[in-house]
A protein has these predicted regions:
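Mixed-charge, Lys/Arg-enriched low-complexity segments
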Residues: 2-3, 64-113
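Small/flexible residues
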Residues: 7, 11-13, 28-30, 56-61, ...
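Short linear sequence motifs
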Residues: 10, 23, 27, 48-49, ...
Length: 113
């Protein structure tokens, strides 16, 4: 997905997800991008249309045993977490360059959370 297509999807409020190489063989890793206006918990009533888009970017790794065992994965099972809010599209695109080859999709597949 090109940068422009990524931004177009996010501007519609669509979260995007993608798997990335993990740091160890026992782990799997993902990136999730969650667009929002206001705070990560949502806008105040009545001002959603005037607020700029911001982007919560979560990167984490999960032990394969949780995924392959088809267990529910909870926050406490996440390892090597990064959780940041990007205030602009330029910041977001710069952040995404940390993961070359990241293939984002609006279909989470086996995204565990």
């Amino acid at each position: 997905m090109t940068d422009e297509r990524i931004l177009a999807r996010l501007r519609q409020g669509t979260p995007l997800y993608g798997e990335i190489p993990a740091s160890e063989p026992r782990l799997r890793a993902w990136v999730g991008i969650y667009p929002f206006k206001g705070t990560p918990h949502g806008p105040r009533p009545g001002n959603a249309d005037v607020l700029p888009w911001r982007y919560r970017v979560r990167k984490f790794e999960v032990d394969r045993k949780w995924i392959e065992g088809q267990f529910d994965v909870h926050e406490e099972e996440l390892e090597r977490q990064e959780d940041v809010v990007m205030g602009s599209e330029a910041q977001l695109l710069e952040r995404l360059r940390r993961w070359p080859g990241l293939a984002l999709s609006d279909r989470p597949g086996d995204y565990p959370i």
